[in-house]
Regions:
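An N-terminal assembly and electron-transfer interface module characteristic of large anaerobic redox
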Residues: 1-157, 161
Length: 161
């Protein structure tokens, strides 16, 4: 679900900043959030990859106006501050109202950071080698899950970002 959430968040913030018909991006985001909740429980790898393609394709259909490039503003800090509107006092909404394109880091990146930290910690103080191998396996699995997302995003209209 985290891979879906990261992709949907990325598509939401990118499109919402430039959408011509206000509200269409959020409407599509909500539709895909509900659909992804169902897909998580019963989809195969093939269906997962197809759904990633479908999400990107649907968001690409939203009319946007990029004639005026907006400043990109990243939200950083503790996890709750970055991702939860109540935790950051709705800063993303305020930034968008001021004409910015909000950039949020992928949550999966945070998970990979934690796993990498555990591996490094193991190397430095020689703790449980089995746990280190589990974290390495987790990173490989994350990379495997993110691969179709990265592939799809390479072919979007904003691939340079």
């Amino acid at each position: 679900m985290v891979v879906y959430a990261d992709l949907l968040q990325k598509m939401l913030t990118k499109n919402r900043a430039y959408e011509i018909n206000k509200g269409k991006t959020k409407e599509l985001f909500d539709y895909w959030m509900e659909k992804c909740k169902k897909l998580v429980n019963k989809s195969s790898i093939k269906e997962f990859k197809q759904s990633i393609f479908d999400i990107v394709s649907d968001f690409e259909k939203i009319e946007i106006d990029t004639s005026v490039i907006k400043p990109k503003v990243g939200i950083v800090g503790e996890v709750l501050i970055k991702y939860h509107p109540f935790g950051n006092n709705f800063v993303a909404d305020k930034l968008e109202q001021e004409g910015a394109e909000v950039i949020l880091p992928d949550f999966m990146g945070f998970i990979k950071f934690i796993a990498t930290h555990k591996i490094t910690f193991n190397k430095l103080i020689k703790t449980d080698a089995i746990k280190a191998k589990l974290f390495k396996t987790a990173i490989k699995l994350i990379d495997l899950l993110e691969k179709p997302v990265i592939s799809c995003l390479l072919y979007t209209s904003d691939a340079a970002d």
